[in-house]
Each structure stands twice: as C-alpha cells, then as structure tokens.
Curated annotation (Swiss-Prot):
Family assignment from sequence similarity: Belongs to the anti-sigma-factor family.
Gene name, Swiss-Prot/TrEMBL: rsbW
Gene Ontology molecular-function annotations: ATP binding; protein serine kinase activity; protein serine/threonine kinase activity; sigma factor antagonist activity
HAMAP family listed in its UniProt record: Anti_sigma_B
Domain of life: Bacteria
Record has ATP-binding as a keyword: yes
UniProt EC number: 2.7.11.1
EC top class, as a word: transferase
Native organism taxonomy: Bacteria, Bacillati, Bacillota, Bacilli, Bacillales
Name this polypeptide is given: Serine-protein kinase RsbW
General function of this protein: Negative regulator of sigma-B activity. Phosphorylates and inactivates its specific antagonist protein, RsbV. Upon phosphorylation of RsbV, RsbW is released and binds to sigma-B, thereby blocking its ability to form an RNA polymerase holoenzyme (E-sigma-B).
Catalytic activity as recorded in UniProt: L-seryl-[protein] + ATP = O-phospho-L-seryl-[protein] + ADP + H(+); L-threonyl-[protein] + ATP = O-phospho-L-threonyl-[protein] + ADP + H(+)
Length: 160
C-alpha cells in the first residue's frame, strides 16, 4: 500500500529574485506541519542553496524554470527541486569538497560545491539525479519529541 501524502507544486523563473518566494512557501508549509523553528531555518538554507545552484549554473545565458514539489507526509517533508539545464556529476563534486575541516579558515573552503555540502549537512537525506538537468530530493523528518510533553507539569505558583 502506498504511503499517503499531500503534494504542493510550484514553478518559478530561474532568477535570484524568485528564490525568496520558494523559501517563504517552504517555511509556511513546514510550520503548518509542526516542524521546530531550528529545523525550518535549516530547510530554508537548504532550499535556498538548491535553488541558487540552479540560478547560477543550470541555464547559462538562458532563463529557464525551477520546478519545486513539496511532499507532505505524516512524519516528514520531502522537497524536490529540479531544472532542465546543464547537469554535473554530484559524486565527483562531493569528493572535491570533502568533509569540512574545522581547522581551516572559512576563506580557504572551496567555493564550488559548498552549497551542496550545506544541503547534505542540514537535511536528513539528500538524493541527486542528473540526466537532462538536475533533480535534488531533500528530506527532513519531524522531530516530535522536541514538542511533546515530558510528563512534568510546570506551575506558575510558588510552593511554600
């Protein structure tokens, strides 16, 4: 049996000025689903990076589109960001970027691929498919234990 979910689809021009629309939409969806503030902030960075990569690299001089699909599940949000532009080899780029070395100053981090490194760090799962264009599928699980009651009621009254 297929898992039930709701789907929200959007298309925007692959221009920097439209990335904020996607970021705000995602934040609204995640808030409604019950995500914690920090998780929403992480997802805002991740979706901004995915869209910005498309704006900067996918279409060269042409202006294409970015397709975004939000899959709303009971326990997670899946975000698909896709383009039909120029593709690249994610695994090769990932090897070049490598793990973050805390001893290196920020100025010495490689610029290419840092966005994908951030996405990989901030999301629970990331899958990248590249045939004609690029599709990034990012998943973030709702951490319900952050908002559940721990069984210790808090009182505003002082005990004497």
């Amino acid at each position: 049996m297929m898992e039930r979910f709701e789907k929200i689809e959007m298309k925007i021009p692959a221009k920097a000025e439209y990335v904020a629309i996607i970021r705000l939409t995602m934040a609204g969806v995640a808030n409604r689903m019950g995500f914690a503030y920090d998780d929403i902030e992480d997802m805002k960075i991740a979706i901004s990076e995915a869209c910005t990569n498309i704006v900067q690299h996918a279409y060269k001089e042409d202006v294409g589109e970015i397709a975004i699909v939000f899959g709303l599940y009971e326990d997670r949000l899946e975000i698909m960001v896709a383009d039909n532009g120029v593709s690249f080899d994610f695994n090769n780029l990932k090897r070049k970027v490598g793990p973050y070395d805390i001893s290196k100053p920020v100025e010495h981090l490689p610029e290419n691929g840092l966005g994908l490194y951030l996405i990989n760090t901030l999301m629970d799962d990331i899958q990248i498919m590249h045939d004609e264009g690029m599709t990034v599928l990012m998943t973030k699980y709702i951490q319900r234990e952050q908002v559940e009651n721990d069984g210790n009621p808090i009182s505003t009254y002082e005990s004497y």
